Regions:
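Transmembrane alpha-helices and adjacent helix-loop boundaries
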Residues: 1-262
Length: 262
């Protein structure tokens, strides 16, 4: 039976390798989910309607029009039907209403069940790719709701002022809305980022060798050391240090953006 001093170097090296995988998944998710979340937020606020061109006509219908009230109601519903918004919000509802672990299993196994082949490839690279896509899609949906709240929280009068000045919609977003939105979303985004650090451990459900998987391997005896539970507890130190550093960095960013504070 090996002693603690003999086990420690082996465990430390394995946990470092697992933590690097955790870091990779964390940063890949952030890099992918933030821009995708912004795009999804635009979709959830979309005002496009396939029959929107009829809206001015309906507004100008004379009161003595031969259309019945029911026909007018049907027309109004048809004009106000916004398919992009409905589809995007339905997807967000599904993603937010189901566990991330279940989504990981669906992303990894469902394509193989339908296509009868493993589209992710074999080995750790395939599992990492599947995990990354599942995490990006999940967190993009959560981020999109934060972005939507930040955008809609900017007073409409400022956007209207930009239109009066002759600015395009793109110019209004980048020069008027974006900076104010960023300040509003930092606190809720900080919470989601810290949650992401811990959620990366869920990827072990498809055997991605992140840090928790590495710690469990020693308990199961698959790393040459059998029945050692202390490596699993030791993983908490990695999470605490990384979460602490992120909390400090995000706190400084929030203070820097808090320009209303005296």
């Amino acid at each position: 039976m090996t002693t603690f001093s003999e086990q420690f170097p082996i465990v430390f090296q394995a946990l470092n390798v697992g933590f690097l995988q955790t870091l990779k998944l964390f940063f890949v998710t952030l890099i992918g989910a933030i821009p995708l979340g912004l795009i999804i937020s635009f979709g959830s606020m979309s005002r496009w309607s396939p029959l929107g061109f009829l809206r001015p006509y309906l507004k100008n219908l004379p009161k003595d029009s031969k259309l019945t009230w029911w026909q007018k109601t049907q027309l109004w519903f048809a004009v106000d039907f916004r398919p992009i918004r409905l589809i995007v919000r339905f997807v967000i509802w599904v993603v937010r209403g189901t566990p991330l672990m279940l989504q990981l299993l669906v992303f990894y196994y469902f394509p193989g069940l339908v296509l009868h082949k493993n589209i992710w490839g074999s080995g750790e690279a395939g599992r990492f790719l599947a995990s990354s896509i599942a995490f990006i899609f999940n967190y993009a949906c959560y981020f999109s709701e934060i972005f939507r709240g930040g955008i809609q929280g900017v007073p409409k009068g400022q956007q209207e002022a930009g239109q009066v000045l002759g600015m395009t919609s793109t110019q209004i977003f980048f020069k008027v809305t974006l900076l104010q939105m960023v300040k509003r979303i930092v606190p809720p985004m900080s919470n989601e980022v810290i949650t992401l650090v811990k959620d990366t451990s869920l990827s072990r459900i498809i055997a991605l060798q992140e840090i928790i998987w590495a710690g469990q391997a020693f308990l199961k005896g698959t790393q040459g050391i059998s029945g050692a539970i202390w490596p699993l507890f030791f993983t908490g130190i990695y999470y605490l240090i990384f979460s602490g550093l992120l909390t400090l960095a995000l706190g400084k960013l929030e203070k820097k953006l808090d320009y209303f504070k005296a």
